Design a protein with these regions (language model features):
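Gly/Gly-Pro- and Ser/Thr-rich, intrinsically disordered tail segments characteristic of DNA damage-repair
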Residues: 1-225, 368-379, 387-388, 468, ...
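DNA-contacting surface of Y-family translesion DNA polymerases
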Residues: 2, 184, 192-336, 341-349
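Short Gly/Ser/Thr- and Asp/Glu-enriched loop/turn motifs at secondary-structure junctions
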Residues: 102-106, 147-150, 284-288, 334-336, ...
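Intrinsically disordered, low-complexity mixed-charge segments
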Residues: 344-370, 437-452
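Short coil-to-beta transition motif at edge beta-strands of beta-rich domains
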Residues: 380-396
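Short beta-strand-centered aromatic/proline hotspots
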Residues: 398-405
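Short aromatic-glycine-enriched beta-strand elements
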Residues: 408-412
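Intrinsically disordered, low-complexity linker and terminal regions at domain boundaries
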Residues: 413-484
Length: 484
């Protein structure tokens, strides 16, 4: 571990929901939930206002609606999120050549490698400037953690949320970690946490007191050694600029459990086709085919088959997935299916296992038939044209966003990022004056080229509560405020 807190972890605050609030003035300060809106949908992100009601990521959407019935429920706009993420990553790469993205809204940065930080004061200044730059460029807020290791930097950014900065100064790690829950440490999920709790271990300090031998006895050699090292704040993992893709997969959750075995098989074939398209799009091939099945009782089964060599052949992957399905009992119904490929390699013309063209045609036929059947089960085209939260433009009323649609009608609120909360109007779903539109920028450029957050004067739009804590450091002194 380093002797200076020069590893930075950035985590954007409620990213998807904050983007929606920044682009929709009427939702600022309101509960917003982004995710799949069907009966089997899952929450992708909840704004801080929604979290007050107990809504959180990965929660079933039905449960979220019961907890926060008056929240705004929106369909994700991934192209917009990705474009904003790219601007944030550009700011990070300006700090250092060693940037390790973890997702669209999260990354590690090695500040020392970029020469912008070498001790606590310089690291803190870099963190403060980064947060200000993110506000100026995107209009959003992010939380920053600084420490001598990746593990601690991530823990620090979590403590900084929302819209804060936390520095864990070298020498203070053990004292800081000691009283924290064992669940704070990476790799300690509900099962491991319960196992440790039954052994009387609930805090990080109690892990240290139990000793390495006891942890190995409880958790096994690899997990026990690793967890003990983390409890001692030992983490020498470097920031890696390019994270290697380990697998490619697709999965679907179904609004109604699938009971018919033939339908399950056709779904698996369709998912295999989608997986191949994604695999080829990335220029990859793989040798291990993985099938994921979540049953009616939420139990999840995973089956895999390793081939003799890498392939991107759709027939091979379909047939392997079908063989894997043969070993799974789907009695009672299936709520989720997934097909993936791991053991990846660069694209290869490998066709050792390719089947005859006639066999491919037979295999592809049912997929096409199922696609037609599935289309009949989907919502009407008119309803699918207007997903909640997406941008539209009306020839008379201008730019707006969809509040909801159904029964042949679509309701639109007409407002832009730099306007006051707008008026609501309802149209027929086939209104010729209404069309889908591209998102508007969250930050306007002034005459001097500088960024200005719409509707917020010189300050950034922030969706977090007004009363925020000051950020803190391991030594308890010299803290920067969480609002630059």
């Amino acid at each position: 571990m380093r002797t200076a807190p020069t590893i930075l972890h950035l985590d954007m605050d409620a990213f998807f929901a904050s983007v929606e609030q920044a682009s929709k003035p009427s939702l600022r300060g309101k509960a917003v939930v982004v995710g799949g809106l069907g009966p089997r949908g899952v929450v992708a992100t909840a704004s801080y206002e929604a979290r007050v009601f107990g809504v959180h990521s990965a929660m079933p959407m039905g449960q979220a609606r019961r907890l926060a019935p008056n929240a705004a429920y929106l369909v994700p706009r991934f192209p917009l999120y990705k474009s904003i993420s790219e601007r944030v990553m550009e700011l990070l790469r300006a700090l250092s050549p060693l940037v390790e993205p973890l997702s669209l809204d999260e990354a590690f940065v090695d500040l020392e490698a970029g020469g912008v930080a070498w001790d606590e004061p310089s690291a803190r200044l870099a963190g403060i400037k980064l947060r200000a730059d993110i506000r100026a460029v995107t209009g959003l807020t992010g939380s920053v953690g600084l420490a001598g290791s990746k593990m601690l930097a991530k823990i620090a950014s979590e403590a900084a949320k929302p819209d804060g900065l936390v520095v864990i100064e070298p020498g203070t790690e053990r004292a800081m970690l000691g009283p924290m829950s064992v669940r704070t440490l990476p790799g300690v999920g509900p099962a491991t946490g319960d196992h440790l709790r039954r052994a009387g271990i609930t805090t990080v300090e109690e892990i240290v007191e139990a000793g390495e031998d006891e942890l190995v006895r409880l958790l096994g050699k690899a997990h026990g050694h690793g967890l003990y090292a983390m409890a001692l704040a030992r983490d020498d993992r470097p920031v890696v600029a390019e994270r290697e893709t380990k697998s490619v997969s697709v999965e679907d959750t179904y609004d109604v459990d699938i009971h018919d075995r033939t339908r399950v098989g056709l779904e698996v074939l369709r998912l295999a086709e989608r997986c191949v398209r994604r695999l080829r799009g990335a220029g990859l091939s793989g040798r291990t085919i993985v099938l994921k099945v979540r049953r009616y009782d939420f139990s999840t089964l995973t089956r895999s088959e390793t081939l003799r060599g890498p392939t991107d052949d759709p027939a091979v992957i379909r047939e392997a997935a079908a063989r894997l399905l043969d070993s799974v009992d789907t009695t009672g119904g299936v709520r989720l299916l997934g097909v993936g490929v791991s053991g990846l390699a660069d694209y290869t013309q490998e066709d050792l296992f390719a089947q005859a063209a006639g066999e491919r045609a037979v295999a592809e036929g049912p997929v096409e038939e199922h696609a037609a059947a599935a289309a009949e089960e989907q919502p009407s085209l008119a309803e699918r044209r207007w997903p909640a939260g997406h941008d539209v433009r009306h020839t008379e009323f201008g730019h707006g966003w969809v509040q909801g649609s159904g029964l042949g009608r679509v309701t639109v609120r007409f407002e832009t990022p730099d306007s006051e909360p707008g008026r609501v109007r309802t149209f027929r779903v086939d209104d010729p004056d209404l069309e889908a539109a591209d998102p508007l920028p969250l930050v306007l450029r002034g005459p001097d080229g500088g960024g200005r957050v719409p509707g917020a004067g010189p300050q950034a739009v922030s969706s977090v509560p007004a009363s925020l804590p000051k950020s803190w450091s391991g030594s308890g002194g010299g803290a920067a405020t969480s609002r630059p």
